[in-house]
């Protein structure tokens, strides 16, 4: 989809999102997700889609923490990663204020610095959110596929 092909951005070239950076799905391999072993001696911040929806640009707090067992089945994402929700809360975005883990209902985006930035892409996703939400497919709970991005 191409938005705003007007005279003010004629010096920009049209690019696929995948050319602007790397999209990777969050990780939460272990089931059930509420297994207490995941959280024992927790010290690795964990956020969910609701935390991203509630954030104002940056995710600055978390309410859960993985322990070593939890981290082994997940991934600790770098500060500055743009988070994009793909399930439950569709196309909500926020940038990590510090390293955190997130589940597979979230996609992380890290920009190619010579092409874009996470901050710029945050605003791009704010602009196209409704279009992405309208593309969501699901019966009871909407979701989108990472390929849609």
Residue ranges of each PLM-predicted region?
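A generic structural signal for residues embedded in beta-strands
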Residues: 84-85
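Short beta-alpha junctions and helix-cap segments that line functional grooves
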Residues: 32-34, 95-96
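DNA target-recognition patches
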Residues: 18-24, 33-68
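Basic, amphipathic alpha-helical recognition segments used for DNA target recognition
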Residues: 16-22, 53-60, 73-79, 95-101, ...
